Design a protein with these regions (language model features):
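A short N-terminal helical cap/helix-turn-helix that marks the beginning
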Residues: 47, 51-57, 85-96
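Helix N-cap motif at beta-to-alpha junctions
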Residues: 32-33, 72
Length: 96
């Protein structure tokens, strides 16, 4: 569990992520629905492997992501690690 100062400090290293209602949040845009859905599938596969599941919201070519650790009822380091993974996948594959 991270305190408020640790959360704010960790947010500085993430591009575009914000704290919204005590949840890490970011919106991603894509050229097509298929790209958006492929992005969600990559995240879902990785999330299963690490047993840490984000909330994914899809509307055509937009994916909104909310990260929160339910077991600790707070934001934890796991959320920031998953946010980094998500950002890396987006930059490597979908940011064109």
């Amino acid at each position: 569990m991270l305190d408020e100062n640790e959360i704010k400090e960790n947010l500085k290293s993430l591009d575009g992520w914000v704290l919204r209602n005590s949840i890490l949040y970011k919106k991603f845009s894509f050229k097509t629905f298929m790209n958006a859905f492929s992005f969600m599938n990559i995240i879902a596969d990785h999330s299963e492997k690490i047993d840490h599941h984000p909330k994914l919201i899809n509307g055509y070519n937009v994916v909104e992501i909310e990260l929160y650790t339910h077991s600790s009822n707070s934001i934890t380091k796991k959320d920031f690690l998953l946010a980094e993974f998500i950002d890396n996948i987006y930059e490597e594959i979908f940011s064109q």
